[in-house]
């Protein structure tokens, strides 16, 4: 920045320096937000030329997390959406923000509701400045902020400004606190007789955004090696051809019921949707449900190794990668020596393992056979052929919803995948099940539930697409009719949820030839439609109950 000064020194020829341009004494250097290529590369552009196209400023577009729903199950005070001011609220600004290190300015918001004459209720939309926790606000406190109260029957869009209240000159692209747009249910949603089943009746809404004329970006990012951001996708494979992620078998059904266990801690089939593996989950089915280790003839203890033969580092993980996570049952295994150098005969050896005895400590690197191993010393690998009721205590039935004690106690095992539970209101976990051979006290199939198909885990590990929202909205579509059979949420923790249609009527069943399709990113407050109500042609789509 240059300035004129009367105190400027005289030039060499004696002329006064007044009126000449001289450098300012306290010139601030550009902040190196990222490695810069030169002093002129990362300079502020605010107040100069706004590089945002006028079309972007003049047109509203749907926010990436701008879908929300209101149902009679919501109560006053429930948060319908909670959006933070930033370039990520607008797809165009989100793309442009990758070229800059900072941003500043306001945005305009337009809210659309699917109004109709068969519903009544009001919502409140407020702007919560930084420093307030939006999740703890009451309805009365929400009215203290700039707000709009609207009827769900309104046909006109609701428009309001989202001001950039800040105590800094500009915002960097990291996640700094900014103004939040919060929508709550103000009065209960009530439906008339024309709406049919009120449990399945919801009012859908959309949030659209556009930058204000004062919105601008600052500090250009220096040119770097071109990088491509992968878009989030799910495998386009029918469910009937996918496999269980806790043991190798085709998926035989889905459990969609609130009566099923809603808190589980499986260690196989656990993967974040950005590709990070949890627990003992392998990336492919080649290592799944396998046990490998070394044992001496006449001994009972199998010293565990990884499936590929590498040493297992005790205390670093609950068990080797791919180690079975079946708890509350006895394992009956078939193992063979590797490499197999027998000239003839059956190389397989039958052994049994109890998972609730003191010798079962895979976290420490060993498990114990029920009987002495009277076969040659060596390196053995195998898998579980069938399971039975626990030997101790007698009379206990098989429970494949629980995991074994990996150490002397479950709390001693390190790096366990955390338990999961449905975070949304009225939601239930979705399980994919396959039957495993073995007797039980119920004289029924031993259904093994898992949270994700194995092909989904391999896909997420391969793609490693970034997570762009609180949850991914999936539709389960019948490929023959192209009809939507239900809405599901896929959370970043690697599990699906749905809203079962009815309570106490038994688990719902969907046809296994369907395909999950990614629709959009939604807020965790998004209210799912009950399964089976996304289309009026439920009878022809194969939705049925048992």
Curated annotation (Swiss-Prot):
Organism whose genome encodes this protein: Southampton virus (strain GI/Human/United Kingdom/Southampton/1991) (SHV)
Listed name of the protein: Capsid protein VP1
Region (P1 sub-domain 2): 417-546
Source domain of life: Viruses
Spans annotated as Protruding domain: 227-545
Keyword Metal-binding appears in the UniProt entry: no
Cleavage, annotated site positions: 228-229
InterPro entries linked to this entry: Calicivirus_coat, Calicivirus_coat_C, Rhv-like, Viral_coat
Iron keyword on record: no
